[in-house]
Structures are given as structure tokens and as C-alpha cells.
């Protein structure tokens, strides 16, 4: 378990998004934690997910997918190791199914799987994080998607401008941070980074490659068997996958209300795909989304939301390549 004998200083909350933003700010994340303990945790988890758990060192952050027998995703996970236990970060929409599926066969192994409710996940972001890193005594690794232990828990580096802090719920943040009451800005940054996350409607709908999990190192094609492996392998080696996840952006004064997007074909509009995550930045009047659409869709395709008053959408380039080696 985490050791938190000391607590951090209190941070004032910023409730008005139109106020000037500081260089360093944070928000409490709605993402949830699953904790794996026991002598069989590695072998058990290894047989449940798309990732090679042998790669889960103390300083690694690994993406993974948890599939059903047909290869459809129950959840998308980010795994890290701390004090001999494994932790998986997943969304508030995915946690219930993920936990139930992980526990289904745990009775046959020496492993305990529980939702960890004693700790909080805090998204920390800004142009220059050096001041808060110094105050927290965190020396970040140079690599993205890496982790480091520090005196209050675990620091997870996503990139040079974004961290996740996993700390005790009683711990607070340094006074140099402004704590936002909404995670919308964090969610927008996650979407622009092309980081997949499922909403309720997307659970058990897509295979891992449809949410670009292979492009961010979330699938091992060399490991042993796991639930759904046959479908995942067939998608890769037989070229069966026809969909991918795209980043969408719109100039609008309100959030996306639709769950689907349409593309223009001549004078008509046809269904193009579904939204799996959305966010809205009230400061810039920009809405963002992740959508699952055909993987041969051109970046200049005309898109709009499927709703009574459609919103025009543009496709943003992904920050990583979908071309497999």
C-alpha cells in the first residue's frame, strides 16, 4: 500500500474558466483504479489482457486491452507497478465491467482484485512543471509513458506537460497549483494525444485495433494466450480490421450532443462512425472527440455531428502512426 505519513499543502480551486490560467494546474480525474495483489497476480493478469505483463517494471506505464471471448474490448487500461502490487487505470464507465470480468476466474488463482478507493488520481499539466516537481521532490524520467515513485505515491509521466499523480485521498496539492473543478481541459489534452477511452456505448463494441491500441504499444503479438487473442491476431495478420480511431475538433459554443458523426457523399450525408469520448473547452469554444470510423477515411472528409442542429467537424492528424511494421 502507499505510504502517506505527510500531506501536501492546500491548493485554491479555480471555479471560473474565464479567469487567467496559471502555468501549472490540475484536476481530480474521474478515472478509477483496479488493484491486483497476491503471488499469482502476474500470471493471472497476463492471461487476461493484450499486454505482456513481463514488461511491467517499476518504472513502466503500459497500455493494455481487456477483451471478451470475441475480441471485443471490455476496457482499456493503463498499467503500473507500485510496492509489489499492480494497478490498472480505467475510466468510470469501464470500471464495473472490467472488475467483474477480471474477478470471474480469480477464484482459481492466488490473486485478489479490487477497486482501490483509498487513493486519488490527479491530472497535473502546464507549460512548465518544474516548480511543482521540485516541491514534490519528483525527478522525472526522460521517457514518456513512464513512472517514478515519490514520497506521496506514484508519479506517471505521460509527456513533458502532463502527469498523473496517484496519491492518498487525504493528500492535497502544493499551493503553486490551481485546482480546477472540471476535468474538461485534461480530457481535451488526452483526446488530442489520441489516448483511447471507452464510454458506456462503446463497451464490447470494438476490437483493440479499432481504438489504435496497437499504435501505442498496447498489444503484444508475441505473448501467450489470452481471452480474445484469436480475433486480435486475425485482425493483424489477415488484414481484417477496417476501422480506426480519429481525433475530431469543432469550433462551437456548446459541447457535442450527438453520439454519431456523418460524412458528406455528394449531396447526401451518410453515417461515418460513433463518438467514444468528447470534451469541450469553454475558453476557446472548441469541442473535441474521439471517433471510430473507416480506417481509409481521408483527413479532409467533410463531417458533421448527427443531431438536429449539426456541428461541422474537422479531422485532426494523429500524433502517432497507424502503419504497422
Features from the language model and the residues they span:
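Acidic, proline/glycine-enriched N-terminal capping motif
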Residues: 1-76, 80
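Glycine-rich, small/acidic residue-mixed loop/short-helix segments
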Residues: 211-219, 233-325
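Acidic, low-complexity central loop/insert segments
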Residues: 23-28, 32-33, 78-193
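Short, conserved charged micro-motifs
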Residues: 40-45, 95-99, 129-133, 170-177, ...
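Anionic-ligand-binding alpha/beta catalytic cores of soluble enzymes and soluble regulatory domains
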Residues: 166-249
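Residue-level signal for inorganic ion chemistry
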Residues: 38, 88, 126, 228, ...
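Glycine-centered loop/turn motifs
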Residues: 59-60, 136-148, 254-262, 300
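Short amphipathic beta-strand starts and helix->beta connectors
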Residues: 14-21, 63-76, 104-107, 145-153, ...
Amino acid at each position: 500500500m502507499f505510504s502517506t505519513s505527510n500531506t501536501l499543502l492546500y491548493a485554491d480551486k479555480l471555479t471560473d474558466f474565464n479567469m487567467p490560467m496559471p502555468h501549472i494546474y490540475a484536476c481530480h480525474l474521474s478515472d478509477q483504479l483496479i488493484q491486483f495483489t497476491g503471488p499469482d497476480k502476474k500470471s493471472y493478469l497476463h492471461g487476461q489482457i493484450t499486454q505482456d505483463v513481463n514488461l511491467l517494471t517499476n518504472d513502466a506505464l503500459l497500455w493494455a486491452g481487456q477483451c471478451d471471448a470475441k475480441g471485443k474490448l471490455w476496457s482499456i487500461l493503463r498499467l503500473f507497478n507500485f510496492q509489489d502490487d499492480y494497478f490498472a487505470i480505467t475510466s468510470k464507465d469501464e470500471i464495473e465491467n472490467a472488475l467483474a470480468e477480471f474477478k470471474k476466474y480469480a477464484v482459481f488463482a492466488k490473486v485478489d482484485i479490487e477497486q482501490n478507493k483509498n487513493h486519488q488520481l490527479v491530472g497535473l499539466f502546464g507549460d512548465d512543471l518544474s516548480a511543482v516537481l521540485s516541491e514534490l521532490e519528483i525527478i522525472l524520467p526522460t521517457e514518456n509513458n513512464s513512472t517514478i515513485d515519490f514520497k506521496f505515491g506514484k508519479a506517471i509521466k505521460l509527456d513533458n506537460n502532463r502527469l498523473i499523480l496517484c496519491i492518498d485521498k487525504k493528500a492535497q496539492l502544493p499551493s503553486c497549483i490551481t485546482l480546477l473543478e472540471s476535468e474538461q481541459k485534461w480530457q481535451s489534452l488526452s483526446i488530442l494525444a489520441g489516448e483511447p477511452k471507452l464510454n458506456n456505448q462503446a463497451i464490447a463494441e470494438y476490437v483493440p485495433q479499432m481504438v489504435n491500441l496497437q499504435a501505442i504499444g498496447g498489444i503484444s503479438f508475441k505473448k501467450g494466450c489470452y481471452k480474445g487473442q484469436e480475433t486480435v491476431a486475425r485482425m493483424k495478420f489477415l488484414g481484417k480490421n477496417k476501422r480506426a480511431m480519429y481525433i475530431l475538433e469543432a469550433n462551437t459554443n456548446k459541447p457535442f450532443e450527438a453520439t454519431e458523426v456523418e460524412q458528406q457523399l455528394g449531396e447526401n450525408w451518410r453515417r461515418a462512425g460513433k463518438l467514444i469520448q468528447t470534451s469541450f473547452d469553454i475558453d476557446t469554444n472548441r469541442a473535441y472527440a474521439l471517433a471510430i470510423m473507416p480506417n481509409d477515411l481521408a483527413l479532409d472528409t467533410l463531417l458533421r455531428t448527427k443531431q438536429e442542429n449539426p456541428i461541422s467537424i474537422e479531422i485532426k492528424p494523429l500524433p502517432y502512426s497507424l502503419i504497422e511494421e
